[in-house]
């Protein structure tokens, strides 16, 4: 009898719960049959109709029989449905955050039976980002490649002093544009349906110019070797620095050949105390206080007839404590004891090895040239962390570390193929890159 009473109590409790559910939640979600229809789409937080939305934006579908929706896709990306936000006439949903593999500009709605209804709606990618330009010192009329992310056409690109140029084709990571006549130095602007982006880099950037090999007061050779500074029919503008020669071989180990492959700028005159009148500190030309957010940039031309196949381009920075152009152990006008001219800071023989970046683009394919055209090379100063053999350098970099620059194609901890590279360099500069 007690057991029967207990069972009746449980049954009554269940009936009461069911009744409460029916009474208290009359709009509780129930999957329906048939196909949905959408009348329009609006923002979730305001009654404004829209035909497109950004990724991860919350929107509201308005229509009929929306409770029949079992699966929902924007293009080919599935949306996460929450039945708490679905009624017969409205459905609140967040646009998927991933880029579609195929952009169809449609919403796909499947019911439980797998039947399909569609609605035209465009998902916008995130706002564009511009990160690079294949040749920052290109002339008007030349075609360059702009790189970045979310660079989806249709878009426009604007150079200072010119009207925007329409771009109709882009895969999202890069596009090509012909620089318009009248383009002035400065940052470029890219506009897509998702927003506007301005480059950190500048077209024809002359900020922080260390060497242009043309005009004073920018210095040139100031070390043990006077490398070739010349011009020819390939010149970007005026003179350039040349390392290597068709008749000079760089062996497979990138063996030491400073006579042909080392450019040195070591500041300091032969005075006591050492002055910098004729050979200034490179910190006179660029502010390195934010060096972690800066990069060394230059234009590079390597002809296809003389590709580069061995050795690393060692981009070496050093303060006056490691190298200067004057005498050793002599005070300078700022009270520093100068190191004098030497190559020990390069090899680490008898002195701390100076920090450097190792530019080795040939290692990915075994050979590198620039396709008989100039390109811009960007090497962040945060990558100046190596020794000559590719091991990690422990020298503490400070803003005053950047008073000199040595470019030496040598070693780098890689083995390649003997070659006769011709390496042309112009417009070496220290600029912000992020």
Residue ranges and their predicted role:
Residues 16-19:
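C-terminal motif of bacterial Sec signal peptides marking the signal peptidase cleavage site
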Residues 21-67, 114-153, 185, 194-215:
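Beta-strand/beta-sandwich contexts
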Residues 198-240:
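Extracellular carbohydrate-recognition regions
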Residues 213-215, 282-313, 379, 428:
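Extra-cytoplasmic beta-strand recognition segments
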Residues 231-277:
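Short carbohydrate-recognition loop motifs
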Residues 297-298, 314-319, 356, 374-422:
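Extracellular beta-strand ligand-recognition surfaces/modules
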Residues 306-331:
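Beta-strand acidic-aromatic groove motif in beta-rich domains, primarily in extracellular
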Residues 332-395:
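Extracellular carbohydrate recognition and processing domains
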